[in-house]
Amino acid sequence: MRGVRGGEEVEWVAELKAAVMRRDLERLGRYDHHRARQRVRDSFGGEHSRVIEAGGRPVGSLTVRPGAGGGLTLEHFYLDPAHQGRGIGTRVLEGVLAAADAEGAEVRLTVLRGSAARGLYERYGFIVEDQDEVDVHMVRAVRAGAAGPGGS
């Protein structure tokens, strides 16, 4: 992973988000071409955002921000569908969780209702904190030991 290299990469991430989330957003009746991209433009980049690379090329993104009470918030975690199913996202998530555990920080994230990603997060100890008709807000408590499924 590496830092963001300017506005063109932010636009690339905005397009990636729209492609990755379109099916779920349409299913929920929430897809809007402009809005799907604007949130990334408004909040991706800076010191907390990263571009995920494979073979020296960008394949995904994530942002890990300081959150309330010393915790962390995981946002903009998208992986190009052509690179999904290869363990890249799992390795990135494991790295984020290991760092969070080392800091003694819980991790929060939001996933769309019905998203396949929810299963991955649940395997890594995230539980539902709150939800509405569109979003499921999840949290993972600090764990001692490994960040893999089931903990130490």
Residue positions per predicted region:
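A short beta-loop-alpha structural element at the N-terminal edge
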Residues: 1-15
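Conserved GNAT-fold acetyl-CoA-binding loop/helix
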Residues: 21-43
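Conserved active-site tyrosine of GNAT-family acetyltransferases
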Residues: 40, 121, 126
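A short helix-loop-beta-strand connector motif used in the catalytic cores of GNAT acetyltransferases and
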Residues: 41-51, 58-60
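Conserved beta-strand in the GNAT
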Residues: 57-66, 73-78
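Conserved beta-strand-loop-alpha-helix junction that forms the acyl-donor binding cleft
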Residues: 67, 84, 108-118, 131-143
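Conserved GNAT acetyl-CoA-binding A-motif
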Residues: 71, 100-112
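Conserved acetyl-CoA-binding loop-helix of GNAT-fold acetyltransferases
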Residues: 85-98, 119-123
